[in-house]
């Protein structure tokens, strides 16, 4: 009898511990405010997965190949707003992991891969408190083992690209980036990382700066793209 009583007591204590742990781990989903154990609730995770591209490497060609995890619509579009304007940084870590997992499954291994996130200007960084591209890139590197490099800086403040024509976008970011105290050397394979790709004006401007230093930019990886072709 004592052994049975002791076993029952241990089992009850373990159940209480697990319940307390689950309560501690639970949080509110940043997208819908439902209770969630993971970063987002299961419902919102499914909504995000529905935006995933069947072939993330469908645009991996040309002068600056593009690798895009998803389509910039629906829950991805809404979650990006929550990330950048409501400060839900955990969303960046979620997308960094999704992008990294997809990259590892879809792309051949690239030797000496160095990841450079598209930087924010110092004024925007101070206002927002973080650079979403850098958070995504940090998680990407953590999963893939790629090296993170932060020597690229945005030296000139630019207006938001949204609503600008293609030519105006190119003019807006021209001369806005520079390498500062960089230790990058020729022979490295550089992958640019950003949250969203629309016309590509920003990443092309960055690639031009890096290539002017005889650095090889193999492409750009983003969470989502608005391309329809």
Residues of each region from the PLM?
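Glycine-rich phosphate/pyrophosphate-handling loop used in enzymes and phosphotransfer proteins
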Residues: 1-229
């Amino acid at each position: 009898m004592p052994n049975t009583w002791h076993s029952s007591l241990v089992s009850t204590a373990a159940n209480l511990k697990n319940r307390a742990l689950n309560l501690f781990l639970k949080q509110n989903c940043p997208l819908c405010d439902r209770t969630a154990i993971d970063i987002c609730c299961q419902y919102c995770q499914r909504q995000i997965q529905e935006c995933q591209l069947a072939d993330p490497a469908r645009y991996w060609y040309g002068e600056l190949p593009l690798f895009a995890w998803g389509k910039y619509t629906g829950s991805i579009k809404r979650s990006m707003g929550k990330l950048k304007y409501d400060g839900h940084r955990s969303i960046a870590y979620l997308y960094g992991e999704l992008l990294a997992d997809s990259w590892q499954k879809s792309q051949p291994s690239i030797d000496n891969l160095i990841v450079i996130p598209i930087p924010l200007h110092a004024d925007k960084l101070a206002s927002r408190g973080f650079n979403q591209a850098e958070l995504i890139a940090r998680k990407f590197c953590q999963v893939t083992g790629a090296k993170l490099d932060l020597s690229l800086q945005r030296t000139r403040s630019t207006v938001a690209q949204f609503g600008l024509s293609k030519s105006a976008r190119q003019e807006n970011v021209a001369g806005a980036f520079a390498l500062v105290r960089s230790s990058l050397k020729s022979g490295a394979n550089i992958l640019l990382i950003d949250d969203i790709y629309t016309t590509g004006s920003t990443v092309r401007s960055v690639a031009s700066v890096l290539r002017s230093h005889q650095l090889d930019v193999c492409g750009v990886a983003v969470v989502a793209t608005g391309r329809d072709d």
